[in-house]
């Protein structure tokens, strides 16, 4: 997804909309479509990635930019006169995390459609960003998964997460009810042109090989627009409901932490947790959503007794690619810790192994550069306090995979361990390191 905008980087017109939305939570915006002008479309063009996969028309950013002024003017005229048509998206499949052999669909829009989606996202964000609650961290300016992890660590450390409700919404982006989504948006933005444009981005054909289909529900995964539409939906379905209707009725403290459609709810009291678990499925069903029974559970996560000498705490739970557990600190106190989820770590090891095998005949500098990018990306996300062991495992396995497949480049000259050590001096792989602090405030 392109970078979300801050108030300072918005156009003056959008900044006024955002400021009014902040000051008047009940205000309605009847006329916003004119904000998707030539300048807004150019901004959206600039935010697109150069290396993004093309849609069914094969057009890349470089292709579209060859005659940018003409193409943007033409696009704006089609939008203004309501002649714009969203082209079908190209469907591909990527592996599903933690479920070997299973895949999830991803939709790739044509480049021009990405521009329209991003310009529309910019308008929706100006209105809804002031509305969104602090419990929401995904795809929002100034917020991140690391911020969600930091909040989670703080709540657990303070003893306010004795019970953790770990929930998984089944195929959220596929099951989202479009009619209810449009109704939610209409309450804040009763602008017919915006409604029609969102509809065109949702009711879009899907091209899979030679077969074309049209889905009646959900929002295409991979769409530039899907993250904010998902946030708007869950803002109404979950965030507001929990903070306004559920929290005031609980006997102890409780908190929701959500990143896109991934969320946990933490409770001080078991009875509160059980009551919420009972009503959560009914709440989701009202909006066409369902929780996966095998992935939705209530986990006891109390801090172990001070007198407990060894071992770890009670059960563990997973959130945003990490497994959370209790561990003794160097000072002897029980503290919450997290490590890379086992399935996520193994998936990364397998990817590196396959990459080294497939690309073993490339030059050493080319392999070194590509491996370095993959490892740095992993360390930048998973390099949080206390996760050094998982990072070290990946480092060791990456070196082992590279050595194994470099050995098999040639039948005549075998790469010895000594020569591989020398090679690593000239082409060192990135060292695992802690890149993000999630401890403290």
Annotate each language-model stretch with its function.
Residues 203, 209, 291-362, 376:
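A conserved non-catalytic segment of reverse transcriptases
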Residues 107, 111-119, 145, 163:
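Duplex nucleic acid-engaging cores and interfaces of nucleic-acid transaction enzymes
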Residues 388-441:
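A terminal-accessory region detector
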Residues 105, 136, 214-219, 336-337, ...:
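Short, solvent-exposed helix-loop connector elements
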Residues 36-42, 88-92, 96-98, 202, ...:
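Core structural elements
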Residues 1-58, 62-69, 73:
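Non-catalytic, polymerase-adjacent accessory regions of viral genome-replication enzymes
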Residues 255-259, 296-304, 370-374, 391-399, ...:
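A glycine-rich phosphate-binding loop feature that marks nucleotide/adenosyl-phosphate handling sites
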Residues 78-79, 83-93, 131-302, 316:
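Conserved polymerase palm-domain catalytic core
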């Amino acid at each position: 997804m392109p970078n979300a905008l801050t108030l300072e980087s918005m156009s003056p017109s959008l900044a006024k909309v955002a400021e009014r939305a902040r000051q008047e939570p009940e205000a309605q915006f009847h006329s916003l479509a004119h904000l998707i002008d030539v300048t807004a479309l150019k901004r959206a063009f600039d935010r697109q990635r150069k290396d993004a996969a093309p849609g069914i028309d094969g057009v890349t950013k470089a292709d579209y930019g060859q005659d940018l002024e003409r193409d943007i003017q033409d696009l704006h005229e089609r939008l203004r006169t309501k002649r714009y048509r969203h082209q079908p998206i190209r469907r591909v499949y990527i592996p599903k995390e933690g479920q070997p052999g299973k895949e999830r669909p991803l939709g790739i829009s044509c480049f021009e459609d990405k521009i329209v989606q991003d310009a529309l996202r910019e308008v929706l964000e100006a209105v809804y960003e002031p509305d969104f609650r602090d419990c929401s961290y995904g795809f929002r300016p100034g917020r991140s998964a690391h911020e969600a992890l930091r909040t989670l660590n703080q709540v657990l450390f303070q003893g306010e997460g004795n019970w953790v409700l770990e929930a998984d919404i089944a195929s959220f982006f596929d099951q989202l009810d479009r009619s209810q989504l449009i109704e939610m948006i209409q309450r804040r933005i009763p602008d017919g042109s915006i409604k029609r444009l969102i509809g065109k981005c949702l009711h879009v054909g899907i091209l899979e090989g030679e077969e074309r289909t049209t889905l009646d529900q959900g929002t295409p995964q991979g769409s530039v627009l899907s993250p904010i539409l998902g946030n708007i939906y869950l803002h109404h379905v979950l965030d507001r409901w929990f903070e306004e209707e559920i929290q005031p009725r609980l006997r102890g403290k409780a908190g929701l932490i959500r990143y896109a459609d991934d969320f946990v709810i933490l409770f001080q009291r078991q009875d509160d947790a059980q009551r919420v678990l009972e009503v959560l499925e009914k709440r989701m069903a009202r909006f066409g959503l369902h929780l996966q029974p095998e992935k939705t559970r209530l986990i006891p996560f109390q801090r172990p007794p001070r007198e407990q000498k060894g071992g770890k705490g009670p059960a563990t739970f997973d959130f945003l690619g990490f497994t959370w557990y209790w561990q003794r600190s160097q000072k002897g106190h029980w503290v919450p810790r997290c490590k890379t989820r086992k399935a996520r770590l193994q998936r990364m090891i397998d990817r590196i192994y396959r990459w080294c095998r497939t690309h073993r005949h490339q030059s050493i500098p080319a392999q070194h550069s590509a491996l370095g990018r993959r490892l740095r990306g992993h360390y930048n996300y998973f390099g949080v306090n206390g996760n050094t062991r998982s990072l070290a495992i990946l480092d060791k396995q990456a070196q082992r995979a590279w050595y194994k497949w470099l050995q098999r480049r040639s039948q005549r000259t075998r790469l010895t361990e000594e020569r591989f050590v020398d090679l690593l001096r000239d082409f060192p792989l990135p060292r695992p390191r802690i890149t993000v602090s999630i401890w403290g405030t």
